[in-house]
C-alpha cells in the first residue's frame, strides 16, 4: 500500500469509540438525485473503431482499453451560475466519449457528481439572500434542463456530495487509520488534512513542479497558509464545523467534506478502485484530480486511480476565459431563450478540438447555425451520394482523440456534394442523419 504512515494508538482508539454510532446516523441517506431524460440514440450498423485519447498523465494519445463495461467519472458542477458554455464544452466532450464507446460495442458506467456543499455556493447564497440548499436545487434543476436540451446522454449515477457524506467519512477514517491524514492542532477548528506526500507517486497526474503546484493550490481553493499544517500543499479532507455553515456528525467531530475527497469517495463506491477515465476541465488537473486520485490510491493501494486522465480546454469570451468569478458567462439557458437550436450549440463547441482553449463568439454561433442548416437541407433530399465513406470517416476521426473538426469537415464535404450535385442513393440522407445523431448528438 502506498500510504505507510500510521495513526497513534490514541488516535485509533478515539476513532473506534465514535465510528459505529455516527455511521448508523448517517447511513440513512441514500442516493436520491435524479439525472435527466435520456435522448434516443440510434444504433449504427457494425461497430466503430477503438477509442484513443490524450492522457494528461502520460502526455500522449493512447488507446483506451476498457472491458465490456467502460467506466468514467466526470466531476460535476458546483450549482450556481449554471450552465455556462465552459460547463457545456466539458460535458459535451465526455458525451462524445460515451457515444463513441457505445458505438464500439461497450456498455458504459458513467458517474457524475454535484458539488452541492462548498464555499462558493454559500457565498453566492448569502449574497442573494437565499438558502444554500434552495440555490443549489434551483441551479441543479437548470443544469439538468440544459443537459437534456443539449441531448447529453445522462450518467448512470448522478450523485450529490450531500448524499455521499457517509462514504466520505469512511474514506477519511481509512486515511486517518493509515497515517495518510492528520488532525491539525487547533482546539477551535480541528480540521482533517491529507499528507500530500502520502503516496510516492504524488504529482504524476499533473506533472507539475512544486512551485507550480503551490501557485495553483492557492488559486484554486487550497489553503497553503493555514496554520498547523504539516505541508502547505496538504489538502483538506474534513472541515470542522463553523458558525453559519452546514455540518454532519463524524467520528472526528461535526463538519463537512473537503472538495477532493468527495469525488474519490463517490467514484470508488460506485465504480471501484480503478476507473477507465477520470475527466473534467483542464482547470481540474491540479489540485482537484491530483488529490482525488491520491486519496483513492492511498485507500485502495492501487498505483493509479484512472487509466486515463482526460481534460477539456477552457472556453473564452471577449478575450478572457469564461468564468463565474469574472462574470463573463454565456449561459446555455439564455441561448435557448433566444431561440438558438441546441444542435447549433453543440456544433459551435465541436468546431474546435476539445483539448484546445478556444473562444465563443457571435461568428462561431453564426457558422454553427449555417452548418446545421446545410446538413439538414442535404439530409432532407430524396437522393444523395453514397454515405458509407463519410460515416466511416466520422467514426474514425472521433475515435482518434475526438477529432471533431475533421468529423465536421467530412460531413460538410458530403453535404456540399449533395446540395451541389444530388445523388441517387435514397438511403444516404437517413444514414448520415442517424450517424450525426448517434455520434455527435445533433438531431437533423
Curated annotation (Swiss-Prot):
Name of the protein in its database record: L-cysteine:1D-myo-inositol 2-amino-2-deoxy-alpha-D-glucopyranoside ligase
Organism: Mycolicibacterium gilvum (strain PYR-GCK)
Residue ranges annotated as motif 'HIGH' region: 77-87
Motif 'KMSKS' region, residue range(s) on this chain: 321-325
Domain of life from the UniProt record: Bacteria
Cofactor(s) demanded: Zn(2+)
Cofactor binding comment, as recorded: Binds 1 zinc ion per subunit.
GO cellular component terms attached to this protein's record: cytosol
GO biological process: cysteinyl-tRNA aminoacylation; mycothiol biosynthetic process
Entry's Gene Ontology molecular function annotations: ATP binding; cysteine-glucosaminylinositol ligase activity; cysteine-tRNA ligase activity; zinc ion binding
EC number: 6.3.1.13
Span of the annotated motif 'ERGGDP' region: 219-224
Assembly and interaction partners: Monomer.
InterPro entries on file: Cys-tRNA/MSH_ligase, Mycothiol_ligase_MshC, Rossmann-like_a/b/a_fold, tRNA-synt_1_cat_dom
Residue positions binding L-cysteinyl-5'-AMP: 75-78, 90, 113-115, 259, 281-283, 315
Binding residues annotated for Zn(2+), in chain numbering: 75, 263, 288
Catalyzed chemical reaction(s): 1D-myo-inositol 2-amino-2-deoxy-alpha-D-glucopyranoside + L-cysteine + ATP = 1D-myo-inositol 2-(L-cysteinylamino)-2-deoxy-alpha-D-glucopyranoside + AMP + diphosphate + H(+)
UniProt entry tagged with the keyword Hydrolase: no
UniProt entry keywords in alphabetical sequence: ATP-binding, Ligase, Metal-binding, Nucleotide-binding, Zinc
Enzyme class: ligase
Family: Belongs to the class-I aminoacyl-tRNA synthetase family. MshC subfamily.
Function description: Catalyzes the ATP-dependent condensation of GlcN-Ins and L-cysteine to form L-Cys-GlcN-Ins.
Amino acid at each position: 500500500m502506498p500510504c505507510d504512515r500510521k495513526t497513534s494508538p490514541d488516535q485509533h482508539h478515539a476513532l473506534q469509540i465514535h465510528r459505529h454510532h455516527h455511521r448508523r446516523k448517517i447511513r440513512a441517506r441514500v442516493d436520491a438525485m435524479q439525472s435527466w431524460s435520456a435522448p434516443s440514440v440510434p444504433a449504427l450498423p457494425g461497430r466503430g473503431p477503438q477509442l484513443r485519447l490524450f492522457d494528461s498523465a502520460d502526455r500522449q494519445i493512447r488507446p483506451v482499453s476498457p472491458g465490456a463495461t467502460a467506466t468514467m467519472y466526470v466531476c460535476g458542477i458546483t450549482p450556481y451560475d449554471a450552465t455556462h458554455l465552459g460547463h457545456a464544452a466539458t460535458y459535451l466532450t465526455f458525451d462524445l466519449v460515451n457515444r463513441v464507446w457505445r458505438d464500439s460495442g461497450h456498455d458504459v458506467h458513467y458517474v457524475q457528481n454535484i458539488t452541492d456543499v462548498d464555499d462558493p455556493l454559500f457565498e453566492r447564497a448569502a449574497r442573494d439572500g437565499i438558502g444554500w440548499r434552495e440555490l443549489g436545487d434551483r441551479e441543479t434543476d437548470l443544469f439538468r434542463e440544459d443537459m437534456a436540451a443539449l441531448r447529453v446522454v445522462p450518467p448512470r449515477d448522478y450523485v450529490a456530495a450531500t448524499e455521499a457524506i457517509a462514504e466520505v467519512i469512511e474514506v477519511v477514517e481509512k486515511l486517518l487509520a493509515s497515517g495518510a491524514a492528520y488532525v491539525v492542532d487547533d482546539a477551535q477548528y480541528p480540521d482533517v488534512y491529507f499528507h500530500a506526500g502520502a503516496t510516492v507517486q504524488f504529482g504524476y497526474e499533473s506533472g507539475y513542479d512544486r512551485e507550480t503546484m503551490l501557485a495553483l493550490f492557492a488559486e484554486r481553493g487550497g489553503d497553503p497558509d493555514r496554520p498547523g499544517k504539516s505541508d502547505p500543499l496538504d489538502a483538506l479532507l474534513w472541515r470542522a464545523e463553523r458558525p453559519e455553515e452546514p455540518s454532519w456528525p463524524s467520528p472526528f467531530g461535526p463538519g463537512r467534506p473537503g472538495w477532493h475527497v468527495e469525488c474519490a469517495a463517490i467514484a470508488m463506491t460506485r465504480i471501484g478502485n480503478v476507473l477507465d477515465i477520470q475527466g473534467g476541465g483542464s482547470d481540474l488537473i491540479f489540485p482537484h484530480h491530483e488529490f482525488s486520485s491520491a486519496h483513492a490510491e492511498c485507500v485502495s493501494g492501487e498505483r493509479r486511480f484512472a487509466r486515463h486522465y482526460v481534460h477539456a480546454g477552457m472556453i473564452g469570451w471577449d478575450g478572457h476565459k469564461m468564468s463565474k468569478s469574472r462574470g463573463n458567462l454565456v449561459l446555455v439557458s439564455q441561448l435557448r431563450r433566444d431561440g438558438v437550436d441546441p444542435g447549433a450549440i453543440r456544433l459551435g463547441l465541436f468546431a474546435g478540438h476539445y483539448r484546445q482553449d478556444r473562444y465563443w463568439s457571435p461568428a462561431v454561433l453564426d457558422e454553427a447555425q449555417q452548418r446545421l442548416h446545410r446538413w439538414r437541407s442535404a439530409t432532407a433530399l430524396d437522393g444523395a451520394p453514397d454515405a458509407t465513406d463519410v460515416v466511416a470517416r466520422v467514426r474514425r476521426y472521433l475515435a482518434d482523440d475526438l477529432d471533431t473538426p475533421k468529423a465536421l469537415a467530412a460531413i460538410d464535404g458530403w453535404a456540399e456534394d449533395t446540395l451541389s450535385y444530388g445523388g441517387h442513393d435514397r438511403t444516404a440522407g437517413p444514414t448520415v442523419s442517424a450517424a450525426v445523431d448517434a455520434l455527435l448528438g445533433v438531431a437533423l
